[in-house]
Each structure stands twice: as C-alpha cells, then as structure tokens.
Amino acid sequence: MIASKESNSAATPATSAPTLRTTAEIAATAAMGHAPHETFTINLGPQHPAAHGVLRVLMRMDGEWVENAEPVIGYIHRMHEKMGENRTWAKFLPNTSRIDYLSAMHYTHAWVGVVERGLKIEVPERAEYIRVITSELNRIASHQVWWGALLLDLGGFTPILYAFDDREKILDLLEGLCGARLTYCYYRFGGLYNDADDDFLKGTREFVKYMRPRLKMYRDLVTDNVILRQRLTGIGPISADTCRKYGATGPVIRGSGVAYDVRRAEPYSVYPKLQFKIPTYPECDSMARYLVRMDEMEESLNIIEQCLDLIQPGPFMAPKVPRVIRLPAGDYTYAVEAARGRFMVRVVSDGKENPYRARLRTPSFGNLSLFEETSRGMLLPDALAMMGSLDLVIPDIDR
C-alpha cells in the first residue's frame, strides 16, 4: 500500500489567496481609462539567473501581470538520441551522465537496466544495494541544488551556502568511490565499475547521522519561515489533471496529491525489499512541491540506512557479461525515479552492436510544458517562484 504524508495545515500561516487575472479581467482592465491598452513582450533568458540554464521564455506582459509565457527551447540540443543510435551500447554510457548532470546516477541506471533486461543479466545483490545507495545520495545532492537555487530566486542568499556545504559531503563520498564528482558513469552492464570499500560505507553511514539534524535545521530556519510560506503558499497551482495532461511526474505530480513514484509503480532494483513512504501533498501549489522534496530527502536517508544494514559481502559484477553487447531484436523499456521524475529509456534493437532506435523520456520536458498554461494571470515574481518549484534542468529538456 502506498503511504503518503499529509500536509500539516495548522503549521501553515494563514495567507490570503493570490490574485490571478483571467483573460476577461485583463480585457476589462484594458477598457478602463482613456489611455489605450498596451502590452509588451520581454525575454526571460536565454541568459538569466532565474532560468537556471540556457532557457528562453517569451513573456507577454500587462504591467506586472503575465498574459502568456512561451518557453523557447533547443539552445543546447546535443542530439543524445541520435548519438545513442550511432554508438555501441557501451560507448553511449558517458552520455547518460550528461543529460541531467544533477541526477547522473539515475540516468546511467536506466541505460544499464534496459540492456540487462534485454540480455537477461542477473545483477548481484550487493551491486544492486550499492546502486540504490549511490542513487539516493545523488537524489539528495540534486535536491540540495534545487533548494538553494529556489531560495536564491526568492531573495534569500544564505541558504544556498548551507546547501552547497552539505552537498559537498556527498560529492566527496562519490568522488572517493568512482573518481568523479558530477558525471559519474559508475554503473556497468551487470554491475559496477568497482566495489564499494569499507571507507565509503562507513562515510555514508556517518553522513546519514550528520544530515538528519541538518534537515531539521532547514525546517526550523527556512521551511517554517513566514516569508517563505507567503511567497509559495497558493502560488502556481497545478491540478493533478494538468499534470497528467502534460506528462509531469516526480515531485510536481506528487505535490498535486498523486502518489506516483516509479520505485513503487514500476519496481526495479532492490526497492521492493525496502520500506519507504511517498510524500504527497494535496494543495497543488509551489509550497506543496517544496515540502515534497524536503520530505524526500528524509526518505532517501531512510532508504540509504536500510541498504547499509542489508548489504552483504559478495561479487559486484555478474559472472557472465558479453564483451560485445548485442541485444536480441526487439523493443525494450526501463524506467527509474530520477530526482525530477520518471526517466524512461526505450530502445529498439535489430541485433546489432548499436541500437536501431533510442528514445529518452526525460521528466523536465513534461514539467516545463505546463508552465505556459499555469502561469497565465500571475504576477511576474510569482511566476518565477513557480518556475523554481518545478526544478528544471535545461540539458534534460533539450537533450
């Protein structure tokens, strides 16, 4: 049974609902007074701090009110899918760490997972536990970047210093494990590049103990701050139907009350053996999406701790993995729950050394797609706060 965390309405200060202008209200305003009604267009990006990357949003404004906001993408399109079709299965592995560079472990997991499914490779249990540990560490590190950047958008500078300081501890752990701090490429078909030593496992356990009181401090100093709640509560409402309409997943749809998580809906690795909750909030606003991610960091710590207790000595690679990968002709899919939502790999194989077709379904594209509809009638600062709550990574959109 899927568990969910109910929102604590008593802890939320009473705030007045934000004013959203409908098309009719905008037209009525235009008819008032003697001056002719004029709108103007501004470009948010493609180089703007609030865009968090090379994203351009063409915004038609009526004063401070957003009449329409059209995302313009493609500035860093790198043809990952086409490269996947022109490279061997193994040579495409480094690409997976560079699609969503903040969630690299999850993306590599999906690529090796689809190959292992096609070749019916049984991954050793120890390798699966290490994959889950590193994936959840990567999820926390990604949420740290989102948390600090969102508060920076809202005018708070200090929290991002705390976030990056704590994230640095995760990067140090992963660097000691695989030698990289961002684009890891640590997983291999059938297992891992190398085994996790005792120093990594001990350091990870110490990090879990360190991070729990830090998250409580985040909640006391930031989450319960009345200014933050006034900036996010009631801002950017996104209904569950709108999420489904545009294919939004991850914390965005869970912030709209839908307890959809790939780790439960499409179980993979050793997640079925682990106990964890799926945080959901029914309010559908930016504050709900904020709370989902804060709760997810706590759940990731619980998952990591369970894996550390359950992991046993053993091999970290499957004994028989073909040196030359050739998937049997067919259509294969594999999905994971990345930091921003559902990432799915779909490949069509014709039995050769490279895929006939490679399809990468990334979460950020669906999460951005709903911005144009949901931002209409909002004040510009509120629209930027809502965009920050979507946690966009631009290379994940353009691919």
From Swiss-Prot:
Assigned keywords, A-Z: Cell inner membrane, Cell membrane, Membrane, NAD, Quinone, Translocase, Transport, Ubiquinone
Enzyme Commission (EC) number: 7.1.1.-
Chief localization: membrane
Membrane topology: Peripheral membrane protein
Signal peptide positions (record): none
PANTHER family assigned to the protein according to its UniProt record, in alphabetical order: NADH DEHYDROGENASE [UBIQUINONE] IRON-SULFUR PROTEIN 2, MITOCHONDRIAL, NADH-UBIQUINONE OXIDOREDUCTASE 49 KDA SUBUNIT
SUPFAM superfamilies for this protein: HydB/Nqo4-like
Stated name of the protein: NADH-quinone oxidoreductase subunit D 2
Annotated Low complexity bias: 9-20
Catalytic reaction annotation: a quinone + NADH + 5 H(+)(in) = a quinol + NAD(+) + 4 H(+)(out)
Localization (cell): Cell inner membrane
Matching Pfam families: Complex1_49kDa (PF00346)
Taxonomic lineage of the native organism: Bacteria, Pseudomonadati, Verrucomicrobiota, Opitutia, Opitutales
Summary of subunit composition and partner proteins: NDH-1 is composed of 14 different subunits. Subunits NuoB, C, D, E, F, and G constitute the peripheral sector of the complex.
